[in-house]
Amino acid sequence: TQAVKETSGQVLFYGEEPAQTYYYSTSCGYGTDLSVWRGTRAEAYPYLCAQAIDERNMELTRQLGGQESVAAMAPILQQAQLLEQSDVMEAFLGQRDGDFYEKEEPWYRWSYRAETVDEKALWERVWIRAQADGQCVFVPGEAGEWNAVKERTKLSENTGKIREIRVTKRSSGGAAQELLIESENGQVR
């Protein structure tokens, strides 16, 4: 609440336009760009870029300021893009060193392992998601292509006892963009 009180009544600008700003309570040590919000073009908001959330990068951002800072920060942005690779992200998450702001927070780099899964509830949530966004849940087609789920029967053909859930695509900064659910009857992405 301290930051909210200290910035009350202030408006942040990027050039001549009010800046789009977002809040999140914790990260794994990196923030990401707007590609995490489906349908949002990250390049439309170059000031919201994936980068390490640490004192070194924050100081560089403060020093550069303005629109020229995006170009000057290219090496930092390339660093964040490496985290799109699952093996790089996994290695990064295994590291506990670094001067990341949130490293002492309880939800910093958390993990969760379930011994059992309410599969019926999970598949129901997947179906609800497919109905809400027709281009977000996919099943394999006969020729190996991925087809958007439009009918519940197409989803049901690929469900069943879950064998594995894994991240198959990450955004710059390492945020999970896509999951693959492998079941006894097929796959859902």
Where are these regions (language model features)?
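Conserved, single-site charged/polar hotspot
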Residues: 1-189
